[in-house]
Curated annotation (Swiss-Prot):
Mg(2+) binds at residues 458, 464, 467-468. Residues 707-800 form the FDX-ACB domain. InterPro entries: aa-tRNA-synth_II/BPL/LPL, B3/B4_tRNA-bd, DNA-bd_dom_put_sf, Fdx_antiC-bd, Fdx_antiC-bd_sf, NA-bd_OB-fold, Phe-tRNA-ligase_IIc_bsu, Phe-tRNA-ligase_IIc_bsu_bact. Belongs to the phenylalanyl-tRNA synthetase beta subunit family. Type 1 subfamily. Its cofactor is Mg(2+). The gene is pheT. It comes from Streptococcus pneumoniae (strain ATCC BAA-255 / R6). The lineage of its organism: Bacteria, Bacillati, Bacillota, Bacilli, Lactobacillales. This is Phenylalanine--tRNA ligase beta subunit.
C-alpha cells in the first residue's frame, strides 16, 4: 500500500524525516518497502502560461509563446491539447526530467524551442494513473498557478510516498485511518481525523429504494441516494492525492469512492440511479446461466457461488469485485446510489480468483474491513460528493442486515506478560501501551481486561496482547538471554542420510535434480500408480492444474521433460526427491500419509555419436543399472518382476521392484500412448518408496576386515528354455546354499538355430572366496556340483 506522507501528517501531528518513520514502522511490525518522492531527480521545471499558440503548417506541431515568470519563451510543442490561456509545466533548458534526461535549447523543423512543455509521463508519472483527459497530451495546471514557480507543489510531486508491505494479519493498516492509529501509537500522539458534515433533505431515501439480503455471505448492506449530481473532474488536490496513491482520477463521484476506500479502508461503489429498472436492491447468490457485463466491458458468466447485487432481480454488480456497465456513472449521471457493505471474504476471493479480477476493493474484503465505520464511511462519501458535485443527499440510510460493532474483550495478567516477554514491566507500563493504542483497559496487575476496538479485528486472544505490548514497548528494549540448555552433537537423521546417499548415486550417474509441483490435476495425480488412493483436493485451488496432491512424482517430471524437449533439449536425465501423498481415509476428515519418494526419468542418448563410437540410446537396462548401483550402495538385495498392471507404462518393459514381500517401486518405459499425450520421445522412468527403503535398512557395519586370501572364479554356460529369466537363474544358484559364493555375473546370452527352437544359452561367472583361508580346487569343485544340481532342479538347466 502507498502512503502519502503529506496526508499522513494531516492525520497525526508528527514532523520526523520519512526515512526515520519508515524504520520505526518496520521495527514495530509493519514492513516498509521503501520511501520515494515523485520529484526526485527532477529540476528546473516551472509553471508556464501559454500566451499564444500557432499551428505549424502541415505538421502536428504548435509554436507557443510561454510566460515562465521573468521572461517570455518560444517553445515548440506537439501536444494536441495545448492552447493559449492555459497554465502548463515547462522544463527550462538545463532541466532534468524523467530518466535523468536533460533539456537543451534546440530547433524543431527549423523553429527555435527554448524549453519543453511537459506531460505527466515526461515527469516519470505512470501512465496508469494519469487522468484520461491528459493521457495523450500535456498536463494543464490550476488557473491560480503562478508562472515561474516550481510546479511540484501544485501537483504534490514534492510529497514523499511510503510503500508498505501489509501482512494478512494487519489488514487494518490498509487504510489511512489504520496507519494513522499505528503511527500515533508509535510516537504517542493523538489522531486528528477529518469531520465530515452531512446535510440531508427532507425527502427520505427509503421512499425511493429498498434493500434486502438473501444470503449469509453479506452480513450488512447500506445505501444512500444523492440527487442533482454534477459529474465533473475532481479538484486538483484530490487528483494529486489519488495519483500519489497509485489510482487514476476518473471524475468527482468515482474519485470520492476511491478516496473513502483509502481513508477508511471501506470499499464503495456508485450506481447511476436513473439506469435502475426497479427500486429494490437485493443481495443474493447468482443463478446458473446468469451473465453480467462488468465495467471493463467484458461479459461474465456467473457462477452459483458468486455474490451479486441485483435490481429488479437482474444483476447490476459483482459484489465486492466490480460493478456492472449498465449502471456505470457517466457524464450524464445526475442521481447516484452510494453503496457500502460487508461481504464474506472467502466468497469474494473465490469470485475474483475465478474471473481473474483483482482490485483494491476485493483485496480488502478478502482480508477484512472495519465493520464499525461502514455507515461513517458512507456518510463521509455522501458529504464529499455534496461538496464537490453540488449534490443533495436524501434523508437516511437504506440498509439490511446487522453489524456487531462492540469492542472485543481479551484478558491477561501482568505475570503472564512478563513471563512470555522476559521483561519486568509494571502495570503502569502496560497501561501506557494500551492508552497509546487507543484500547480500553480495566483491572489491575493480577488480572486486567483490554477492550479492543473493532478497527483491530486481528486481536482476539491473549497472545495478541503480548505482541502489541512488545511492539509498542519496543522489540529492541526486550532483554536478551541465551538458551539454558546443554549442547548436543549434531548429526543427520536416518532420512537425511538416505537422501544424501540417493543424491550421491543419482548425480554420480549424471542425473540432474529438479523440484516439481506437489499439486497437480486429478488425472495426473493417479498416473503411474497400480492402486490409486483417494484424492486429496484443495477446497479453494488457485487453478485446476494445481488442485490435487500428487500420488506419484513421475507425471511432474514428465512435464519438465516435455518442456525441455519442446525447446530442443532432448538428452535428459532428471531426478527428484520429494513426497507423494496416500489417502486411505476420508480426505475431508483425515490427513494423507506423506511418503518420501525418489523418481527419475531418462530420455535421449547416453552417449552421442562421434568418429569412433556409435550413439548409445537410453534403454531399460541403463535405467536398471542406476537402481542396481543404488541398491548395492544400500546393501539391499531386491528382485525385479515383470508387470503390466501400471497402465501408464509399457506392458512389456516394466518391472515391479520388491524386497521380500515389500514392494519398493517400479521401473519401466513410459507407455507410447502416454508419451504421445506428453509429447515426449521414448522415456524410461523409475520411482522408489524411500520410506519403505529406510525401514528396511540394516545398521551400518562400522568395519569389515578385507580378506588377505584370493578369490576364485569359475565360468558356467547353461542351456535353458527361452522363457527362463536371469533372476530365476540367480535364485537357483543362491538356493544351492554355497556360503563362499560372493558374486554372480551374467556375461553372455546367446540364442539361435544351433541351440534348438525355444532354447537359449546364458553364461555366468561365479566368484568364491573364503575370508579365513585359501580355497582349494576340490572345495570349488564341490561348490560347483551343488550349484549345478540346484540349477538342474530349479530351472531345468543343462550345463554345456
Amino acid at each position: 500500500m502507498l502512503i502519502s506522507y503529506k496526508w499522513l501528517k494531516e492525520l497525526v501531528d508528527i514532523d520526523v524525516p520519512s526515512q526515520e518513520l519508515a524504520e520505526k514502522m518496520s521495527t514495530t511490525g509493519i514492513e516498509v518497502e521503501g520511501v520515494e518522492s515523485p520529484a526526485a531527480g527532477l529540476s528546473k521545471i516551472v509553471v508556464g502560461e501559454v500566451l499564444s499558440c500557432e499551428d505549424v503548417p502541415e505538421t502536428h506541431l504548435h509554436v507557443c509563446q510561454v510566460n515562465v515568470g521573468e521572461e517570455e519563451r518560444q517553445i515548440v510543442c506537439g501536444a494536441p491539447n495545448v492552447r493559449a490561456g492555459i497554465k502548463v509545466m515547462v522544463a527550462l533548458p538545463g532541466a532534468r526530467i524523467a530518466d535523468n534526461y536533460k533539456i537543451k535549447k534546440g530547433k524543431i523543423r527549423g523553429l527555435e524551442s527554448l524549453g519543453m512543455i511537459c506531460s505527466l509521463g515526461e515527469l516519470g508519472i505512470s501512465d496508469s494513473v494519469v487522468p484520461k483527459e491528459f493521457a495523450d497530451g500535456i498536463q494543464i495546471l490550476p488557473e491560480d498557478a503562478v508562472p515561474g514557480e516550481e510546479v511540484f507543489s501544485y501537483l504534490d510531486l514534492d510529497d514523499e510516498i511510503i510503500e508498505l508491505s501489509i501482512t494478512p494479519n494487519r489488514a487494518d493498516a490498509l487504510s489511512m485511518c489504520g496507519v494513522a492509529h499505528e503511527v500515533a501509537a508509535i510516537y504517542d500522539k493523538a489522531v486528528n481525523f477529518k469531520e465530515f458534515t452531512l446535510t440531508e433533505t427532507n425527502e427520505a431515501a427509503a421512499d425511493a429504494l429498498s434493500v434486502s439480503i438473501e444470503t449469509d455471505k453479506a452480513p450488512y448492506y447500506a445505501a444512500r441516494i444523492l440527487d442533482n449530481v454534477t459529474i465533473a473532474p475532481s479538484p486538483q488536490w484530490l487528483q494529486n492525492l489519488l495519483m500519489n496513491e497509485g489510482i487514476r482520477p476518473i471524475n468527482n463521484v468515482v474519485d470520492v469512492t476511491n478516496y473513502i476506500l483509502l481513508y477508511f479502508g471501506q470499499p464503495m461503489h456508485a450506481f447511476d440511479l436513473d439506469n435502475f429498472e426497479g427500486t429494490d436492491i437485493r443481495v443474493r447468490e447468482a443463478r446458473a446461466g446468469e451473465k453480467l457485463v462488468t465495467l471493463d466491458g467484458e461479459e461474465r458468466d456467473l457462477d452459483v457461488n458468486d455474490l451479486v447485487i441485483t435490481v429488479a432481480d437482474k444483476p447490476v454488480a459483482l459484489a465486492g469485485v466490480m460493478g456492472g456497465q449498465a449502471t456505470e456513472i457517466s457524464e450524464k449521471s445526475s442521481r447516484v446510489v452510494l453503496e457500502a457493505a460487508v461481504f464474506n471474504g472467502k466468497s469474494i476471493r473465490k469470485t475474483s480468483g475465478r474471473l481473474n479480477l483483482r482490485s483494491e476493493s476485493s483485496s480488502r474484503f478478502e482480508k477484512g474491513i472495519n465493520v464499525a465505520t461502514v455507515n461513517e464511511a458512507l456518510d463521509a462519501a455522501a458529504s464529499l460528493i455534496a461538496e464537490l458535485a453540488g449534490a443533495t443527499v436524501r434523508k437516511g440510510i437504506v440498509s439490511a442486515g446487522e453489524l456487531d460493532t462492540s469492542d472485543v474483550e481479551v484478558s491477561s495478567t501482568l505475570a503472564d506478560v512478563n513471563r512470555v516477554l522476559g521483561t519486568e514491566l509494571s502495570y503502569a507500563d502496560v497501561e501506557d501501551v494500551f492508552r497509546r493504542l487507543g484500547f480500553g483497559l480495566s483491572g489491575n496487575a493480577d488480572s486486567f481486561t483490554v477492550r479492543v476496538p473493532r478497527r483491530r479485528w486481528d486481536i482476539t486472544i491473549e497472545a495478541d496482547l503480548f505482541e502489541e505490548i512488545a511492539r509498542i514497548y519496543g522489540y529492541d528494549r526486550l532483554p536478551t538471554s541465551l538458551p539454558k540448555d546443554d549442547g548436543t552433537a549434531g548429526e543427520l537423521t536416518a532420512t537425511q542420510k538416505l537422501r544424501r546417499q540417493v543424491r550421491t548415486i543419482a548425480e554420480g550417474a549424471g542425473l540432474t535434480e529438479i523440484i516439481t509441483y506437489t499439486l497437480t490435476t486429478p488425472e495426473k495425480a493417479v498416473e503411474f500408480t497400480a492402486q490409486p488412493s483417494n484424492l486429496t483436493e484443495l477446497m479453494w485451488p488457485m487453478t485446476v492444474d494445481r488442485s490435487v496432491l500428487r500420488q506419484n512424482m513421475i507425471s511432474g517430471i514428465l512435464d519438465t521433460v516435455a518442456y525441455n524437449v519442446a525447446r530442443k533439449n532432448k538428452n535428459l536425465a532428471l531426478y527428484e526427491i520429494g513426497k507423494v501423498f496416500e489417502q486411505t481415509g476420508n480426505p475431508k476428515e483425515e490427513l494423507p500419509n506423506e511418503i518420501n519418494s525418489f523418481a527419475f526419468a531418462l530420455t535421449g542418448l547416453v552417449a552421442e555419436k562421434d568418429f569412433q563410437t556409435a550413439a548409445v540410446p537410453v534403454d531399460f537396462f541403463y535405467a536398471k543399472g542406476i537402481l542396481e548401483a543404488l541398491f548395492t550402495r544400500l546393501g539391499l538385495q531386491v528382485t525385479y518382476t515383470a508387470t503390466s498392471e501400471i497402465a501408464s507404462l509399457h506392458p512389456g518393459r516394466t518391472a515391479v521392484i520388491s524386497l521380500g514381500d515389500q514392494v519398493l517401486g517400479f521401473l519401466g518405459q513410459v507407455h507410447p500412448v502416454t508419451a504421445k499425450a506428453y509429447d515426449i520421445p521414448e522415456t524410461y522412468v523409475a520411482e522408489l518408496n524411500l520410506s519403505a527403503i529406510e525401514a528396511a535398512l540394516q545398521p551400518a557395519t562400522p568395519f569389515v576386515e578385507i580378506t588377505k586370501f584370493p578369490a576364485v572364479s569359475r565360468d558356467v554356460a547353461l542351456l535353458l528354455k527361452a522363457e527362463v529369466t536371469h533372476q530365476e537363474v540367480v535364485d537357483a544358484i543362491q538356493a544351492a546354499g554355497v556360503k563362499r559364493l560372493t558374486d554372480i555375473k551374467l556375461f553372455d546370452v546367446f540364442s539361435g538355430e544351433k541351440l534348438g527352437l525355444g532354447m537359449k544359452s546364458m553364461a555366468y561367472s561365479l566368484t568364491f572366496q573364503n575370508p579365513e583361508d585359501s580355497l582349494t580346487d576340490e572345495e570349488v569343485a564341490r561348490y560347483m556340483e551343488k550349484i549345478q544340481a540346484s540349477l538342474e532342479e530349479k530351472v531345468n538347466a543343462e550345463v554345456r
